[in-house]
């Protein structure tokens, strides 16, 4: 069981506010094209991130095979802390990849401590 960080309650509250806003957009328009993305500094299994990506939304990074499902390496541990959550209208036909060009490199050789996440979303 991973340790519970002191910031967890704040992250969960923030995720709940964002989730409520995204749900309100879907209530107004069931075909709304909603994207919530970024360096959330939290894992896919954390309560806040899991809530953001719960149905009907989808965390596209979870489509990747587990060995490729990371965007950051800290003290030798590969971690997924960057996320792309989309509404059903965007999930259909979406493509996602993480380009592992930074996280596996030494500090001197990389341009960032995170790998870039590439997402292709369907046109209307």
Where are these regions (language model features)?
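Metal-dependent phosphoester-hydrolase catalytic domains
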Residues: 12, 19-35, 40-124
């Amino acid at each position: 069981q991973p340790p519970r960080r002191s910031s967890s309650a704040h992250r969960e509250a923030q995720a709940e506010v964002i989730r409520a806003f995204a749900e309100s957009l879907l209530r107004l328009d069931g075909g709304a094209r909603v994207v919530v993305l970024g360096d959330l500094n939290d894992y896919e299994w954390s309560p806040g991130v899991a809530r953001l990506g719960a149905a009907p939304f989808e965390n596209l990074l979870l489509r990747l095979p587990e060995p490729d499902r990371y965007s950051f390496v800290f003290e030798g541990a590969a971690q997924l802390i960057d996320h792309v959550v989309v509404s059903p209208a965007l999930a259909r036909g979406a493509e996602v990849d993480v380009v592992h060009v930074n996280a596996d490199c030494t500090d001197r050789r990389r341009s960032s401590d995170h790998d870039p996440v590439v997402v292709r979303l369907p046109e209307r």
